[in-house]
Amino acid sequence: MLDIQLLRKDLDGVAKRLADRGYTLDVAAFSALEAERRAIQTRTEELQARRNTLSKQIGAMKAKGEDTSAVMAEVGGIGDEMKASAAKLDEIQARLSELLLGMPNLAHESVPVGKDEADNVEVRRWGTPRQFDFDVKDHVDIGTPLGLDFETGAKLAGARFTMLRGPIARLHRALAQFMLDTHTQQHGYSETYTPYIVNPEILYGTGQLPKFADDMFRVEKGGAENTVTQYLISTSEISLTNTVRESIVEASALPIKLTAHSPCFRSEAGSYGRDTRGMIRQHQFDKVEMVQIVAPESSYAALDEMVGHAEAILQKLGLPYRVVALCTGDMGFSAAKTFDLEVWLPAQNTYREISSCSNTEAFQARRMQARFRNAQGKPELVHTLNGSGLAVGRTLVAVLENYQNADGSVTVPEVLRPYMGGLERIDAPAQAS
C-alpha cells in the first residue's frame, strides 16, 4: 500500500508515476474524498472545542446555582453531531483505503519506463546454449516416455495438471532438495515449512487481494465451520512474508532470510490459450521461494544478492540464462523493482522466465504493519523482498531439454546425482516386444 501522506503532498506526481505502471489514478475522486475528510475533521475539531467551552460553562453555572438545561441540551446536540461526523469519517476512510488497496506500488527511479515485456531491458547473459547434432525434442516428447503423465493428470484434475512418475518424479524432488540445500547451506536462508491454506487478510498483506482474487483458488472448511473462505497459496512468499505481520522486530534481528519449498496454486484466469502444451503454465506447480525482510537502507543490496542466489542455482545446474530488468508496465503489482531470470529452452529456441526477484520496499510492510525498531528506538516499516529460487517444474523442463540425448535419454546434471542415488542418466524403460 502506498503512503497516503505521499498522495496528499504530491498527488499529480504520484498519478504520473502510477500512469507509467499502466494505472490511472482517479485524481478527482481522491481529491473529493480528501476535501470531504478535511471538512469533517475541521468541523469535528470546532465541535470539540465548543463542547469543552460549554462543559466549563456548565460547571460555573452549577456553582452559582443557575439553570443549565439549555446549555446541557446544546452539549447533547453537539454529541449527536459528532457521532454522525465520526460515522461519516469512517465511511470516507474506508473508501480511501479501498482506493489505496487497488493502487500498485511506485516503480523505483532506476526501473525502465515501458508498456509491456517488449520494453524490458536485458542486463546480462550466462552460459552458451548447447549446439545439438540431432533434432531436439521439447520436454513433453522427452519426458513422456520417462514418466511425465499429462493424460492421468488431466483425468484426475483437468487441464494444466500433470502427474510425475518414477525417475522424473525423483528428478523433480532432487531439484527441490538441491535448491533448498544450496540456499540454506550457502546463502544463509532458514528453511521453513508453511501452511498451504491462508486467511484472506494474509493475502491483503502481500497484495494478492483484493485485485487478484480471480487468480486464486478459494477453499471452504467442511462441516459446521464452512462460513470462512480461505485460499490456497499461489506462492510461499505469501506465508513467509506474513510471518512478520503486525509485529515489531529488533534491528539486530535483520535481515530475516527465509526459504521454503511448497506447491503453488494458480487459476491462471488470464492465460487462456497460452502455453497449453506441457508444464510451463500449470494450475499446481512447485517452487522454492526466497524471502528477505530487511532495513530500508539495505533493500537494494539485498535485491542484488537475491538475484545472485537464484543465478547460482542455474549456474550449478549448467543451464544458460539471462537476467532481465522489468519495465514499469510489466512488473508485478507489489514490486518497486524486479529482475527476471530466463532460462534457455532449446525446443522453443528462446529464453523463458524461471525466476522473478522483487523488492517491494515498504509496500507490503505497510499493508501488514510489519515494522522494526530503528536506531532511535522508533518503529519503522521494514522492506520486504521475494524471489523464486527456483520454479521447480520449469527447472525440470529446462533440465530435460538441455540435457537430452539423441537416444531419448536424459543426462542427470552432476550436482543432482547425489540426490539421485548416483544415477547419471535417465533412460526410457525398455518396450515390451
Swiss-Prot record:
Keywords: Aminoacyl-tRNA synthetase, ATP-binding, Cytoplasm, Ligase, Nucleotide-binding, Protein biosynthesis. Its main location: cytoplasm. It catalyses: tRNA(Ser) + L-serine + ATP = L-seryl-tRNA(Ser) + AMP + diphosphate + H(+); tRNA(Sec) + L-serine + ATP = L-seryl-tRNA(Sec) + AMP + diphosphate + H(+). It is found in: Cytoplasm. GO terms for cellular component: cytoplasm. Catalyzes the attachment of serine to tRNA(Ser). Is also able to aminoacylate tRNA(Sec) with serine, to form the misacylated tRNA L-seryl-tRNA(Sec), which will be further converted into selenocysteinyl-tRNA(Sec). Homodimer. The tRNA molecule binds across the dimer. This is Serine--tRNA ligase.
